[in-house]
Amino acid sequence: FVGIQKLGACFSYDPDRQLYEIEAKKLKGAYMLLDEASVTGTANILMAAVLAEGKTTIYNAACEPYLQQLSSMLNRMGARISGVGSNLLTIEGVEALGGTTHTILPDMIEVGSFIGMAAMTGSDITIKNTGYDMLGIIPDSFRRLGITVEQIGDDIHVPTHDSYQIETFIDGSIMTIADAPWPGLTPDLLSVFLVVATQ
């Protein structure tokens, strides 16, 4: 809500109807530093700011592939967004947007879940059209658990495993898997990694 309010919108809540309402005559560009690099928060601010009057600057913006593709689509529709793929987005408001066609990215959480499922069950799987270049460290994180993750074009092949061995460092210690904002590991896959690591 805070980012949209900084653009000039007013929120109200009616407890009797349990309803939030938002109102704004005209949104105006603003500077904002987000408390957290929220994907949903950044996306909502971005969609509002492209039609706001003037310049909006978002520091600590989320930069996950989801935001990159949203920004690319909005730019093709006539928006003026710069800094795509970084944590600093600058949006010059435009009067209107036009139409476009867009193909959405495969869901990286689904791709990671399928890799984990194949590893847990010792199954052979080929995952088609994974958007491999936008998976970040997901494939390498599974490889560090000893899982063979083969890239074949935009597909991923995980062959049958009877067992797998977690990599150790030169001193014999084992790795730590932790979530982090993009390009780090998405927290949505930690439960999958936890189960895979215990098999």
Language-model segments: what does each one mean?
Residues 1-199:
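Structural preference for solvent-exposed beta-strand-turn elements
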